[in-house]
């Protein structure tokens, strides 16, 4: 059979399964608690801010918009036509013009230097900017309106070279080993390590090695120049893209930290350990500053070793990464759950630890006490069995009462997203309660937050951990490249994903989210009556998916 026939037959089978389960879902709906449909008010933005994102991926752009909406912030993005599209970089000149025209109109702007300099994160892995390009951008950034606050961020290149670079990627292991050895020699001065470094260098073509080194040299030069622009109203943040505790990215971070200390810029410049989540962290920091609120967060780990665990693609251990993000946002660590505004429940599943019913019951007890809990659900091997969520579902934990949830593939991405959601939700709730908001507005906030949580569950757990691995296998079996989808294959793949996630949304609603009230006040209980999802692939690959979640709410007098 041809590839087209196989895909068509597969789509028909999926459609039939969807139809059967849709009917089953309608029947299951009868099992949900009865409630009267409720039309909730849409949240009204209190302020607009500007975001020039790291790239066009939803997690860097539209997700930040959704987080902002939780806190009453309208996040303005550049026109989509200006932004990157997978292998096509952003139109840097148009982006700069957009920024120059709009920056002075808003009190706060979050600006990715990598998008302006390279055209996005993927382009930054492929392109080495010239000193002339760097100096020109630094000059443009310096000329932005000083009367408006800016948060500019730049990302240190990752340890591994891009898979798109040939022949560079053929020497991936040798380059990684070279990077780590070079840093260890810098730290220790060891003669034995120096000898091993020289042997490793000899295995790499000179042009490939020079290109690899130049990426960090260019990054160091630009970042140290960016450091000079730091003021109280122009904050600078440096991130690390897919790093490790040792390597050239670590050496670059040490240079930046030394310069920050030497120039006494600790209040104006920060270093953090991630990339995709930086805009969400900076959004949260601005909100907390505007609210004059320094929340306290209690860090609770599912296992004794989790705090000191080294997770994949992280430059520091779990505890250090969390404290770094709290400091960056302007939050502090609480010593007890009772003194905290938010509990950060941290799961780091790995070969030695998998969560069980014990952890699920512990989390439910926290929710029963009325604690606001943000769940960071991380897996060292990117396996569903290492996550908390399956245990929560199996033990009927009230997931709809979580303040936040995230389970990205990289720990800092998960922690940054969950902390941002949890703090923005708790902060906005605090504002509304202080202002004496009515029950309807409070319910609308709880419902909006649950909508965001449902989206993260559907993407981080159901898509990334369950659908994505099998989808990759199916595509490869049909001779389709999962990271280079043709237009027709992309459409059929989107249909497949839509069917799978629609079923999971129905199941999630009827098995958990819709079975208990997500909010109760003044003798009224508020339930999730419906949950549906729209899906598409933002780029011609299956690595990420763009979701739009819709929910309906009902009320019941208890």
Residues of each region from the PLM?
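An N-terminal assembly and electron-transfer interface module characteristic of large anaerobic redox
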Residues: 35-558
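N-terminal membrane-anchoring alpha-helices
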Residues: 25-39
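Feature marks short, highly hydrophobic, charge-poor N-terminal signal-anchor/signal peptide-like helices
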Residues: 9-11
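Hydrophobic membrane-insertion alpha-helices, especially the h-region
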Residues: 15-29
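Short, Lys/Arg-enriched N-terminal segments with co-localized hydrophobic residues
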Residues: 1-6
